Amino acid sequence: MKNKTSAGLFSRAKEVIPGGVNSPVRAFRAVGGNPLFIKRAHGAYLVDEDDNQYIELINSWGPMILGHGNELIEKAVRDALSNSLSFGAPSRKEVEMAELIVSMVPSVEMVRMVNSGTEATMSAIRVARGYTGKEKIIKFEGCYHGHGDSFLIAAGSGAVTMGVPDSPGVPQGVANDTLTAPYNDIEAVRILVEKNKNKIAAIIIEPVAGNMGCVLPKAGFLEALREICDQENIVLIFDEVMSGFRLSVSGAQGVYGVQPDMTTMGKIIGGGMPVGAYGGKKEIMQNVSPSGPIYQAGTLSGNPIAMSAGLAILQYLQASPALYTQLNDQTDYLIHGMRKANNLLGLDYTFNHVGSMFTMFFTNIGVYDFETAKKSDLSKFAAYFQAMLSRGIYLAPSQFESLFISSAITKQLADQIIQAHAESMKEIHN
């Protein structure tokens, strides 16, 4: 497979862009080789600068639930373009978008549009702190909430009460206000809350984690978090940037039946355009400026092009509940075929999945938090990634990222993926 053009672009990029990429995982550091530079996409396919074509399972890291080049979304964008790229003023589209989100997600009574998932989570934490008058937050090891300082914290062994900076540039003072617990460990949460009585403003969690691979909440875990937050006057925030509108018309909270106080959103709500949102109870959200004292603003927030794309996809999803059944069935079919291929080789690797999100972990133990996810054989994953790539299948270049199925993945394409998987597994296991 030729990649001379991509290699040349990467060489040029490294001279002017840190690491040659605008988001670290794209650099292929975890899997070796040079990243592929993509020039176009259609349906379930990516095409790189050397004209290699790949069936892809990352959906632009989640947003492209209908596949690439969807005419419904592209028409909405084309129509909006005739009115200007940006107004810097309120527009009809942002009102319609907010009304639609509120109608689809029962826990959200008011919503504010921003430009990214990171902005959404940073803003939600600020609002929770302002609303409660408390400063500390609890997050979960392995959950990713964007690159805000408060979230770049990881707990070392046994460090359940004090965060440590996980990136140079994160002040120790910020780290001190971010407490971490293992995902799915409700007792660790109870201990943190008890040791920091009346100091916790918010608990933020991915209700389905996607950035340590796909990791699901244990039965009763989300319900227990809800109970703790109710008892201790803590704002429960679900980060549904990845799972929102991906797992159901109301996201993971619709699947698991637990309502948070606040929700952050992104990815799918922009239909591929850069966008984010945060919302929740009116009692909380009415504290956001200009109706309240908690400041948050953005020049391009509510951008009419992004709103038009988002409206198109959300209206379609709301009107097409059968799509989720289709996506779930196709994901089940794909995983069944992949697992069968593994079994024929005597392999028992762990699959985690819910809806159209899934990960195959290169370990045979159950994966339910970051520590168990890290038991995966990363060298085997890297070899698998390259073997699949050579067969025209583009995966996330990290063991610790969820894969996604779009509606563009037909049974025929799923069979191609299963065949490539079987060949790749045989190759890397000799």
Swiss-Prot record:
Reactions it catalyzes: (S)-4-amino-5-oxopentanoate = 5-aminolevulinate
Keywords on record: Cytoplasm, Isomerase, Porphyrin biosynthesis, Pyridoxal phosphate
Signal peptide start and end residues: none
Localization per record: Cytoplasm
Enzyme class, first EC level, given as a word: isomerase
SUPFAM superfamilies noted in UniProt: PLP-dependent transferases
Organism: Cytophaga hutchinsonii (strain ATCC 33406 / DSM 1761 / CIP 103989 / NBRC 15051 / NCIMB 9469 / D465)
Record carries keyword GTP-binding: no
Major localization listed first in the record, in broad terms: cytoplasm
Keyword Metal-binding listed: no
Modified residues (N6-(pyridoxal phosphate)lysine): K267
GO biological process, one term: protoporphyrinogen IX biosynthetic process
Any one GO CC term of the record: cytoplasm
Family annotation (CDD domains): OAT_like
Protein name: Glutamate-1-semialdehyde 2,1-aminomutase
Pfam families given in the database record: Aminotran_3
